[in-house]
Amino acid sequence: MNDQSMTIRGKDRYKSGVMAYKKMGYWEPDYVPKDTDVIALFRVTPQDGVDPIEAAAAVAGESSTATWTVVWTDRLTAAEKYRAKCYRVDPVPNSPGQYFAYIAYDLDLFEPGSISNLTASIIGNVFGFKPLKGLRLEDMRLPVAYVKTFQGPATGIVVERERLDKFGRPLLGATVKPKLGLSGRNYGRVVYEALKGGLDFTKDDENINSQPFMHWRERFLYCMEAVNRAQAASGEVKGTYLNVTAATMEDMYERAEFAKELGSCIVMIDLVIGYTAIQSMAKWARKNDMILHLHRAGHSTYTRQKNHGVSFRVIAKWMRLAGVDHIHAGTVVGKLEGDPNTTRGYYDICREEFNPTKLEHGIFFDQNWASLNKMMPVASGGIHAGQMHQLLDLLGEDVVLQFGGGTIGHPMGIQAGAIANRVALEAMILARNEGRDYVAEGPEILAKAAATCTPLKSALEVWKDVTFNYESTDAPDFVPTAIAAV
């Protein structure tokens, strides 16, 4: 779009009154971002009649140093340095009235190692700006100098696998169902049967904390008894994600300490506790040698809509900085929102040391993670044993596959559900390691395994026709164009 700078220079720049943002220095098409700049990509939908350049410049201004009128105190600062600079505005393909705005922020605008401070600027005030119909933060480029101020995941994928002594396959889990209403004893029974049947983990759901039907301490005691018995019976390392989410940090620390005293290797928190609390728990987890699982409870309130909010790829980047070890990242084939290419982009952010620009996955910038540990993505929500070949193909092996209903809803019982999932996974991994086309042959591989495994046979019969084929609300805006061979 318009590549001419409109910035007013000299004393007229600070004349009292209202001035267009693009004339105040927030639109600089000649600006070349520095390696140390934080770069944000916004999807901007201006109100009818609002100039897209002015709208993008307003986003830059309101997320950095500007207010609605000129203030003379700007002259007391290094204003040229501290102003965010929108340097590029492009129409969004196939989305009339929407524009991608690229905005660069000087690193000195942000407190080191603070997600709360970063978000207070980038998404703090500007999303309610009246000249915009909608605003969405699509992606960010975080400079190495900034990334290095964060601790990153407390444990990381490599150490977690070493601790569990499980390699070469996805980990298996299940969320205890029903999520609310069970007594502590019955809750522990579910955990025991699922782990004994072959799962690696079970987990609390996002809203099980400490309610009248089951106090948190009671749940922790019964769950860890179940874990210990399942480990003794199977000879494998097992775990259960004990949700320590609570009303205050003091309560969360108390619950986490109790989980540690009982011998748990992992604790869980919800995204809704907030960025400061998440970072605090991540520091506790590293100090106490614990794995930290994050349930992304509440994320869809601002990640799902295409024209307003924050993309989950950005949330994933923030959480890798913050220091969680596990994060729910979508399933593609399950019941929850998840375009295949977009979801692959989320998984790339979790697991790669360097993310190259990959527009078909929604990744707009190269991202160097500066040796921060990798996060283990978690696939959960509406998946079952009959999809095992698809899950392995789409999500890879560094992932936790959580079959909640697909374990506990098994017609032969919880342990049988766990056996079905474990046998299906082992059969698919064997086929992959033998060099077979396990994606194309997946149904055949599962049918052969089911011939000698009644629980798997039953699972395939019950859920064979269950699919969740709905159009995604968040597909990438760019896809590769085929080039004819010459």
From Swiss-Prot:
SUPFAM superfamilies per the UniProt record, alphabetical: RuBisCo, C-terminal domain, RuBisCO, large subunit, small (N-terminal) domain
InterPro entries, alphabetized: RuBisCO, RuBisCo_large_chain_AS, RuBisCO_lsu_C, RuBisCO_lsu_C_sf, RuBisCO_lsu_fd_N, RuBisCO_lsu_N_sf, RuBisCO_lsuI
Top-rank EC class of the record's enzyme: lyase
Site feature (Transition state stabilizer) residues: K335
Known catalytic reactions: 2 (2R)-3-phosphoglycerate + 2 H(+) = D-ribulose 1,5-bisphosphate + CO2 + H2O; D-ribulose 1,5-bisphosphate + O2 = 2-phosphoglycolate + (2R)-3-phosphoglycerate + 2 H(+)
Residue stretches spanning the membrane: none
Expression triggers: Expressed under CO(2) and H(2) autotrophic, but not under heterotrophic growth conditions.
Disulphide linkage map: none
Highest taxon of source: Bacteria
Modified residues (N6-carboxylysine): K203
Binding site for substrate: N125, T175, K179, R296, H328, S380
Active-site residues per Swiss-Prot or TrEMBL entry: K177 (proton acceptor), H295 (proton acceptor)
Binding positions for Mg(2+) per the UniProt entry: K203, D205, E206
Alphabetized UniProt keyword annotations: Calvin cycle, Carbon dioxide fixation, Lyase, Magnesium, Metal-binding, Monooxygenase, Oxidoreductase, Plasmid
Record-level GO BP terms: reductive pentose-phosphate cycle
EC number: 4.1.1.39
CDD domains in the record: RuBisCO_large_I
Function: RuBisCO catalyzes two reactions: the carboxylation of D-ribulose 1,5-bisphosphate, the primary event in carbon dioxide fixation, as well as the oxidative fragmentation of the pentose substrate. Both reactions occur simultaneously and in competition at the same active site.
Family statement: Belongs to the RuBisCO large chain family. Type I subfamily.
PANTHER family linked to this entry: RIBULOSE BISPHOSPHATE CARBOXYLASE (PTHR42704), RIBULOSE BISPHOSPHATE CARBOXYLASE LARGE CHAIN (PTHR42704:SF17)
Subunit comment: Heterohexadecamer of 8 large chains and 8 small chains.
Additional notes on this entry: The basic functional RuBisCO is composed of a large chain homodimer in a 'head-to-tail' conformation. In form I RuBisCO this homodimer is arranged in a barrel-like tetramer with the small subunits forming a tetrameric 'cap' on each end of the 'barrel'.
Protein name, entry field: Ribulose bisphosphate carboxylase large chain
Source organism of the structure: Afipia carboxidovorans (strain ATCC 49405 / DSM 1227 / KCTC 32145 / OM5) (Oligotropha carboxidovorans)
The gene coding this protein: cbbL
